[in-house]
């Protein structure tokens, strides 16, 4: 008999390091890759893995995310086990916990244990909703069952110099976790590989009994400590549970020949920008064109993109770029850029290495370089952005450490 697996996506992230993109939306709702939202990649991982029972746990500035999922992720009403359902923070355990919203990743699941009980899940796959990657969750589940683990953690080898931002684990020869350290300044390295650490991707599969016991022991009656990385996983190890690591690099993706090595935490503006730029290379490591692993999202029924004008010096053209429906390149040039729906670049404009969200207009003779422009911004004719840091900062734009300029949503020049 096929096991009952419930997916839970943690989508309550505030994403403060992505401000101003998260000024009016949560991190999982931030647009990415021309037509997607960050949350779409986690949902697609479940759907493409044949797992159709998914709760999305939301909290911070969730309206944009709510509308996106309600528009784009509906199965209908005929199959009760096929659902993508939003679960906002609602103080469900008020009598026990008092006046408390979700206080951490583990607490978000703890406050919704009734959903797991009602579903009668055998296994619960708890995944982060704010990373860019492809993952065959079914394969991870198979390894979880095969090793008879109580908890399985998706693991990603990373340079030790970067690993302090993540949970880091040590494993034995069978990849059973022996130690776990959450965001420590000097992370331990992989034995024999002094420059690499084995980091947690924030994706877990729990056997239901172990999840119930660990959440009850870790959270019930506590006043601090409500996270999987800080509290639940260390508790599982100290209490003798079988915690297994799963090697993400061995995760098979149908239709993909190269190893599955692409995983990006787009938690900073620079990381977010570079992940978008990854998509426009000739042969990107993260391939969004694999028909055997389709990437679905909300349909906006936009018209096709269009390129107009071809006179000398006034040609509508784009190079090494991707753009969504409704975009019009009207006598301007776009290079190495990612354009959202209904973007319009006017004559003699030049857009280089930019990420333009939906409904952005770039005026005539404007020049943009390494700029993220949020939705509904009209850039006047003759405007330059990204060419003079001091000028950009004087206009109130965020300029990152690596020189990426961010124009906030609805900015008026």
UniProtKB/Swiss-Prot annotation:
This is Glucose-1-phosphate adenylyltransferase. It comes from the Bacteria. One of its GO terms (biological process) is glycogen biosynthetic process. Belongs to the bacterial/plant glucose-1-phosphate adenylyltransferase family. It is an enzyme of class 2 (transferase). Alpha-D-glucose 1-phosphate binds at residues 102, 167, 182-183, 200. Gene3D superfamilies: Hexapeptide repeat proteins (2.160.10.10), Spore Coat Polysaccharide Biosynthesis Protein SpsA, Chain A (3.90.550.10). Pathway: Glycan biosynthesis; glycogen biosynthesis. It holds the Pfam family Hexapep_GlmU. PROSITE patterns: ADP_GLC_PYROPHOSPH_1, ADP_GLC_PYROPHOSPH_2. GO terms for molecular function: ATP binding; glucose-1-phosphate adenylyltransferase activity. Keywords: ATP-binding, Carbohydrate metabolism, Glycogen biosynthesis, Glycogen metabolism, Nucleotide-binding, Nucleotidyltransferase, Transferase. The keyword Transferase applies. It catalyses: alpha-D-glucose 1-phosphate + ATP + H(+) = ADP-alpha-D-glucose + diphosphate. Homotetramer. The lineage of its organism: Bacteria, Thermotogati, Deinococcota, Deinococci, Deinococcales. Involved in the biosynthesis of ADP-glucose, a building block required for the elongation reactions to produce glycogen. Catalyzes the reaction between ATP and alpha-D-glucose 1-phosphate (G1P) to produce pyrophosphate and ADP-Glc. The gene is glgC. Its EC number is 2.7.7.27. Disulfide bonds: none annotated.
